[in-house]
Each structure stands twice: as structure tokens, then as C-alpha cells.
Amino acid sequence: MNQEVYDLVIIGAGPAGLAAAVYAKRSGLNVIIVEKQFPGGKIALTSNVENYLGINSIPGPELAYKMYEQVLNLNVSIIYEAADEISLKEKYKKIKLTTQTLITKTVIIATGTENRRLNILGELEFENKGISYCAICDGPLYKNKAVSVIGSGNSAVEEAIYLATIAKEVHLIANKPQFKAEQQLVQIANNTPNIKIYYNKQTFEFFGHQFLEGLKFRDLITNEVTTLNIEANFTFIGLLPSRINTNNLCIFNEVNGFITTDKNMQTSVCGIFAAGDIVDKNVRQIATATNDGVIAALYAKEYITRNNW
């Protein structure tokens, strides 16, 4: 075969993919990363990280860069393209990118997740015109303005706290009677003067002219409708798997779209592994993502050794 054959191609440069790259490279594998956006994954879009062992508190972009820098120092290359398709080519795996095709012995799918949308009136119309899914990216545009955050988990509460340092007022809207977020975060939000919290509220419409001007929500108990005048909304209501076309390999779970693996992070196809938030599991944290990446890399190495490559 004239084309270069990699030992391992990692799809995704979030914590799982970067951790896998470190262990794969240190074990002697010829490894390359494919990333369609930027290194660090969702960490790079997080205002602050306070639950990663060994680091009390660090801005998300800084932690993402430290991970990326460690991989660069090992001379691991990153191709900035989308991975469109994975297929089998004899005993190898073929990965079709936007402008080229890679041949590899093993693959780690670490594509992560995408933001879930509300699918309500006005959402698509005002996306990038006031509706955002990244507070650290777009929050500074709304200094001393009124903004809203929709969601009840850690991400929603964390980003509301961050936005409160920028915006004049932050309306934090949950469709549940209480937050799912850590109590420490909820306490901080409750004690932040310019955060107003709403429980049992279902947002059903965004409105405006050229840009977002407000939203409407309904009280799930009284059915009362309230209109809020805001200039930006940040939605954090969960995640959807970021999938790749795998033809008929049946790697992705057709029910929920995530990937089921064994304890070694191997999928239903030998030599194809998965790591991080794309894996079908209950807990998705930075620590669990890096853990998956390490295991996947070590067993990719074991797979190659076992097959006498």
C-alpha cells in the first residue's frame, strides 16, 4: 500500500481525544488527530473549571490549551477537517475527510456531543442574532444588558453565574421545581444579586425583529404566560451525540445515537474504539472523558500488537 497507514486515527480533540493521543504517542504508535473545530472540546467554551483533580480553579480555555500544548509537545499532528465517514478497507479502516482519506489500523471516535435545542418558535430565526449556546464566546457582547439562561443543570447555573459578571441582569429559567445542578453552584446563583431565578417555567417562544428582543414562558402549574425583554439567550438543556456516517457498521446506537463499548472502550467493530461523551453512559465529566481516552489508547495498542502489525 503506497498511502501512509497510521497506527491510530483519533477523531475529536476534546479531553478524551487529547488524552488518548498522549498515551498512544508515548506507547510508540504513529497517531494523528482529526478535529473539525478547535482543540479542547467544550472545555474551551466553559468559563471556569473547578472539579478537575489537582486544579482548584482554572478558566476553561486555559485548561483546554494546556491539554492541547501537551499533545503538541509530543509532536502529534492535528488535521483540522471534518471526518465524514468511516468504513473498512480489507484489514484497515478508511476515514474519509473533507479533502482527503486516511488509512489506519485502529480508530478512536471521540467526537463528543452537540447542544440540544428547544425547537420552539423563533429559535432558528434568531440563532447567532441573540440566541447562543456559548456564554464565554458571546457573553461579552452583552455587557450591561439583560440576558436569559435556560436550563437546570450545572452548565446552565455555571454560565448564569459567569454572565452575571458581565450583564446587567440574568434571568435563569428552569422547567423543573428545582435545579439538577450541584448545590454549591445553586447557592452562589441564589446569592448573586443580578440573577433572577424562575422555576417550573416552560419557554415556548423567542421574538424580535432583526435581532432577539425577548422570550415568552408559561408557568407549568398556573399556566400563566410571562414575557421577558432580553437581548440574548443562552440555552443549556442537554446534549446530543455528534455522529459520523459509519455506513453499515452499526457502531452508533440507533435508539439514542451514542456508542456502546465494552470495558476496553472497543465498539462492536474490532479495532474501532470510542471515548468521552459520545459513549453511551450516565456520567459525562472531564475526568471520565480522559479516563476513556487513556483506556481506548492502551487497548488500541494492544489490538495492534495482538494482530502482529
UniProtKB/Swiss-Prot annotation:
Short name of any one Pfam family annotated for the protein: Pyr_redox_2
Cofactor note: Binds 1 FAD per subunit.
Keyword Transferase: no
EC number: 1.8.1.9
Assigned keywords, A-Z: Cytoplasm, Disulfide bond, FAD, Flavoprotein, NADP, Oxidoreductase, Redox-active center
Reported cofactor(s): FAD
Keyword Cytoplasm: yes
Disulfide bond residue pairs: C134-C137
Entry similarity comment: Belongs to the class-II pyridine nucleotide-disulfide oxidoreductase family.
Subunit structure: Homodimer.
Protein name: Thioredoxin reductase
Organism: Ureaplasma parvum serovar 3 (strain ATCC 700970)
